[in-house]
Amino acid sequence: MKKIFKFILASFPRPILIKLSFIAQPLLVYFLKGNTYIDPIDGKGFRRFLPYGYGRQRENVLSPSTLSLERHRLLWLYLKSQTDFFIKPKKLLHFAPEQAFYKRFKKIEHFEYVTTDLNSPIATVKADICNLPFESNSFDSILCNHVLEHILDDTKAIQELYRVMKPGGMGVFQIPQDLKRDITFEDHTITDPKERAKLFGQYDHVRVYGTDYFKKLESC
């Protein structure tokens, strides 16, 4: 199973993977249903989760029903239990919308929900994160998860996120991070997918963030 999923992840770009998931998801839910693992996003149980990972495959991490990973489920639980995110009416901007959240956010009547990405087939606005087509101070909340590590000019991208967020707004800007690394490592001369995967962890990543990521967010 791990070899199959690793091959699929390595062979198809993300927009195609999203389209393929529409076909595979109902079958996976049916054949893997059980009660060993519970997905807190939809409450469904499975005898096991699926493996996932572009390099080293992790066992039992991808939920068959929501296609959520650990970070998605943790974020869901945090937003539900520690914030008023789901309670207050808001205009929400969601970059590269995760399938785990997309349908659920879209159904919330007191959300004005806007999705954006350059390539995602489920994004409503095709836009460059470094040059967003939105007015300043437009959004109450912004979700931008595991996007910035793909962007060459992440400083400009973060500045754009701040520009379109309302004063006092909430932003969740998750990135993959090496907590043992003090300084972010990036080298824009590295363009070979295999070399990027080796150095940055994934073929389409352009850096590995260190603990200085938080200072970068503060300085932009």
Each PLM stretch: what is its role?
Residues 118, 144, 176-178:
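An acidic- and aromatic-residue-enriched active-site/binding cleft used to recognize and process polar
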Residues 2-133:
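Conserved N-terminal segment of class I S-adenosyl-L-methionine
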Residues 140-152:
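A short SAM/SAH-binding and catalytic strip from SAM-dependent methyltransferases
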Residues 3, 15-18, 24-37, 41, ...:
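S-adenosyl-L-methionine-dependent methyltransferase catalytic module, highlighting the catalytic core
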Residues 128-130, 147, 205:
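Residues marking the start of alpha-helices
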Residues 95, 134, 139-143:
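Hydrophobic beta-strand segment of the Class I
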